[in-house]
Amino acid sequence: MGTARFLSAVLLLSVPLMVTFPALLSAEYHDGRVDICSLPSDSGDCLRFFEMWYFDGTTCTKFVYGGYGGNDNRFPTEKACMKRCAKA
């Protein structure tokens, strides 16, 4: 019984890594750091409804954020998104 609980806990705790790791593989890196503007949109893990903005590689696009999790390609306004991600 203890082993089954342990394995269930390990599996449950590894789910966020299974979701996050592929996104990091597809991201671009600059000076060893992830370029957040190259990350895909990620609505997160919760079911709340926040209108946010992400950079899609060309422009800033609105998406729904659930309120928890996700990645850093998430901005409260289009202006903040463009300021951080748009290339001059």
UniProtKB/Swiss-Prot annotation:
Q: In which tissues is it expressed?
A: Expressed by the venom gland.
Major place of localization? secreted
Q: GO biological process: what's one of them?
A: envenomation resulting in negative regulation of voltage-gated potassium channel activity in another organism
Q: Does the keyword Phosphoprotein apply?
A: no
**Residue(s) at site: May bind Kv1:** L39
Q: Which Pfam families match?
A: Kunitz_BPTI (PF00014)
Source organism superkingdom: Eukaryota
The UniProt entry, under SUPFAM superfamilies, shows:
BPTI-like (SSF57362)
**Record key words, sorted:** Disulfide bond, Protease inhibitor, Secreted, Serine protease inhibitor, Signal
For the keyword Ribonucleoprotein, the answer is: no
Domain annotation BPTI/Kunitz inhibitor: ranges? 37-85
Output the Gene Ontology terms for molecular function: potassium channel regulator activity; serine-type endopeptidase inhibitor activity; toxin activity
Q: List the disulfide bonds.
A: C37-C85, C60-C81
Proregion residues are: 28-33
The residues forming the signal peptide are 1-27
Gene Ontology cellular-component terms for this entry are: extracellular region
**Site annotated as Reactive bond for chymotrypsin: where?**
L47, R48
Localization, per the record, is:
Secreted
Family to which the UniProt record says this protein belongs: Belongs to the venom Kunitz-type family. 03 (sub-Kunitz) subfamily.
State its role: Serine protease inhibitor that inhibits trypsin at a molar ratio of 1:1.
Q: What is this protein called?
A: Kunitz-type U15-theraphotoxin-Hs1a
Q: Which organism is it from?
A: Cyriopagopus schmidti (Chinese bird spider)
